[in-house]
């Protein structure tokens, strides 16, 4: 009995952080703008629009329009400047989203730093005098 209890307890973290489905991801993100971090620093910002449309910008980078879709249990993105799919798994952690880049499992994990209802402000390239 003790072994069974220990085995079940070992599964608890796995169960609490299951990959989000497309419907769960859409419900959590649509209409919001998220700031993602990595290694204690800001990484990028993504706005989730209607019809699975997105607007992404690296910190201090130009905005890219794109869309997301579900493929094999992952959330995949394509952008106007990067037509190859970039697939991620998203989980709900204690402090928000956790994203793992599945195209390269060795890549750094991203995490939600903040979210708001404010749209992502995109400046055009080479703005200024």
Residue ranges and their predicted role:
Residues 16-65, 74-129:
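Lipid interaction determinants
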Residues 5, 12-19:
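Sec/Tat signal peptide C-region and signal peptidase I cleavage site
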Residues 6-8, 24:
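Short helix-onset patch at the extreme N-terminus, typifying the N->h transition
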